[in-house]
Regions:
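Divalent metal-coordination and catalytic microenvironments
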Residues: 8, 26, 47, 58, ...
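Active-site mouth loops of central-metabolism enzymes
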Residues: 57-70, 119-131, 151, 202-206
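Histidine/acidic residue-rich metal-binding segments in metalloenzymes
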Residues: 132-300
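Alpha-helix-loop-beta-strand connector modules within alpha/beta enzyme cores
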Residues: 100-117, 166-176, 328
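Metal-associated gating/positioning segment near the N- to mid-region
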Residues: 46-113
Length: 426
């Protein structure tokens, strides 16, 4: 199939340039003004911005095992609606992808249902228990984007050391959910701060995150493993990672849109404000933005975590942990970081597309020769975030009702038109 994206605006060295992008059999074959390219599908992109497709290294697509929350089909459609062309799917599934046979179940679903590039993680431990026997990383590494027990922390230094050694030997990466449950009281639901104390809700202290990060940095220094910290939420975590990078430790990290734009001051006693890790203090939020700007935080990942309406209808105490975010990430960050002057647009694109692509060795992009990974956005849109418009099964977002000034109009992933809200010229 031959596709032409006509008259879009591409940001190059701080300047917008009107550009055509020609795609043949899923590969970018030409870029330039007024291309002569006979195409079966021509999309008029005049007035819209063209970006490399976004990459999210931390999503929960819930299949196999929990299709009432999300499916590969609905989740990948939601990703395309958000401008994403590649996502890495976390392994808290049933069965957990801890063996070749179990991984094949997920791979079959992806092959049959995904409209974008979905790459599975395998679990670090058998059954994704955070302890005990490790998965066969050497056997699985060629089929996965990395190894994670996301949703659980790896409980002991001995287990993590062995995992890092095996992961390094397999030339893969560990994406670590850093949470030490010994710090968290029964029923811990939100940050251990003013809101928790005022409402009598058990709080989750910052130590539960930064203590295991501190442990793992020492192990990473020892083993040389490629190591990535998931959903960083505390100022102490940022400081530890900044220092480790200065020492040359092979470490990267991510944070999420909700941690950059919200803090515990914004909490309401609603399930859509409950996620793990929780929204922290204002000074944590400020430290995360500073870390994103100075490169300590390498990338933005949504931790898109859909649940059923019933599971999110029990307030902060009783609701399941997790919010959706894949369809709202760029509109929110563009509106509240770029338009407010807190971050250059080029940096936001790097943190959402280029940096995760580099670290996780993901192909695709918008240059000639790349596997096509392109998203088209209207940066003059005036919309309000309405969960009823989501393609995800999940509806729980803390940003419901927020005004945003960007909207995805088209997403192209390889030879697939993964999302289309543009009129097409035949």
């Amino acid at each position: 199939m031959r596709v032409l994206l006509k008259d879009g605006s591409v940001l190059e060295q701080g300047k917008w340039k009107q550009t055509d992008v020609a795609i043949e059999n899923g590969v970018i074959v030409a870029r330039g003004e007024q291309l002569s390219f006979p195409a079966e599908k021509v999309f008029d992109c005049r007035g819209f911005a063209l970006f490399p497709g976004f990459v999210d290294v931390h999503v929960h697509l819930r299949e196999p095992g929990f299709s009432y929350k999300e499916t590969i089909a609905t989740g990948s459609a939601a990703c395309a609606h958000g401008g994403y062309t590649t996502v890495c799917a976390m392994p808290n599934l049933n069965p957990a992808p801890d063996s070749s046979e179990h991984l094949a179940v997920e791979e079959t679903l992806i092959q049959g249902e995904a409209v974008i590039d979905v790459r599975p993680y395998a679990s670090i431990t058998m059954g994704q228990k955070g302890e005990g026997e490790l998965t066969d990383m050497a056997a699985l590494s060629g089929r996965v984007c990395g190894f994670s027990d996301d949703g659980r922390g790896v409980k002991t230094a001995e287990t993590m050391r062995e995992a890092m050694q095996k992961c390094k030997a397999a030339d893969s990466i560990i994406a670590a959910h850093c949470e030490d449950m010994s710090w968290i009281p029964a029923g811990g639901a939100i940050h251990d701060g003013a809101f928790a104390k005022a409402h009598g809700i058990p709080g989750i202290p910052s130590e539960s995150e930064w203590k295991p990060i501190e442990r793992d940095i020492a192990l990473c220094r020892e083993t040389g493993c490629r190591y990535h910290v998931c959903h960083v939420s505390t100022k102490e975590s940022v400081a530890l990672i900044r220092q480790a990078k200065a020492e040359g430790v092979n470490i990267t990290c991510e944070t999420g849109p909700h941690y950059l734009l919200l803090c515990q001051d914004d909490l309401q006693d609603l399930g859509r404000f409950k996620m793990n890790p929780p929204l922290r203090n204002k000074d944590d939020q400020e430290a995360l933005l500073a870390g994103l700007l100075d490169g300590t935080i390498d990338m933005i990942a949504t931790d898109h975590a859909p649940h059923s309406a019933e599971e999110k209808a029990k307030g902060l105490r009783g609701s399941a942990m997790g919010v959706v975010g894949i369809e709202t990430a760029f509109p929110l960050l563009y509106t509240y970081l770029v338009e407010t002057g807190k971050m250059p647009l080029e940096m936001l694109i790097d943190r959402m597309a280029d940096a995760p692509r580099r670290r996780f060795r993901i192909d695709g992009g918008m240059q000639v020769g790349d596997k096509a990974a392109v998203t088209v956005f209207d940066l003059h849109a005036q919309e309000k975030i309405d969960p009823n418009t989501f393609l995800s099964k999940g509806r729980a977002t803390p940003f419901e009702g927020w005004e945003v000034h960007a909207a995805c109009r088209l997403t192209v992933c390889g030879d697939k038109i993964a999302y289309n809200a543009l009129s097409r010229k035949e």
